[in-house]
A protein has these predicted regions:
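Thiol-/selenol-based redox modules, centered on thioredoxin-like
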Residues: 133-167
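N-terminal "domain-start" segment that seeds a small globular fold
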Residues: 16-45
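Short, internal strand/loop/helix patches
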Residues: 88, 99-131
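Positively charged n-region of N-terminal signal peptides that target proteins for export
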Residues: 1-4
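Bacterial N-terminal signal peptides
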Residues: 6-15
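Short loop/turn microsegments at loop-to-beta-strand junctions
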Residues: 29-30, 52, 128-131
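Short active-site neighborhood of thiol/selenol oxidoreductases, capturing the structured segment around
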Residues: 44-67, 73
């Protein structure tokens, strides 16, 4: 029981620390090359430089909360696409595991492999925290440092409405 308590305390500290130091609103998109679920390299800074893009972080593919978060965005895909939102999901999983996750749940967006924590570091966040970031023309305009699971798409759509008319 004592070990569980210590583990919970450490996780809470890491999560609160990552929220305190997270990428600030108005910051430019991180410039970093990343590996996609297709096994290709993507210049994330360039991908976020034009239009509206969502980057959402989830701790681990195939786990219940992460499935709910990704499937929420999948289910909101048509409405997000109607608003021309590009979506990128990030976890510490390998590109192969991300591809399995994408295929199993029919995810229509690109997943990024962050096995070394470089993407999380570029966003100044913990690898294990669930967060979401909206960029417009390469600038961070909205962030959710305690991103929802099953309500992720709804929260992003509300944020887009609040950021209108430029959405």
């Amino acid at each position: 029981m004592k070990k569980l308590f210590i583990l919970i305390m450490v996780f809470s500290f890491i999560t609160s620390f990552s929220q305190a130091n997270s990428l600030e609103l108005g910051s430019p998109a991180p410039v970093i090359e990343v590996l996609t679920d297709q096994g290709t390299t993507l210049d994330l800074g360039e991908a976020l430089s034009t239009g509206t893009a969502l980057v959402f972080f989830y701790p681990k593919a195939m786990t219940p909360g992460c499935v709910k978060q990704a499937c929420s965005l999948r289910d909101g895909w048509d409405e997000l696409q109607a608003r021309n939102v590009s979506i990128f999901g990030v976890s510490s999983d390998t590109a192969e595991k991300q591809a399995q996750f994408r295929d199993k749940y029919t995810l229509p967006f690109t997943l990024l492999a962050d096995t070394e924590g470089r993407i999380a570091d570029a966003f100044s966040k913990s690898r294990w925290s669930r967060q979401a970031y909206l960029f417009r023309d390469g600038i961070l305009v909205w962030r959710d440092l305690k991103a929802a699971t099953s309500k992720q798409a709804a929260e992003v759509l509300v944020a887009l409405d609040e950021l209108a008319p430029n959405t």
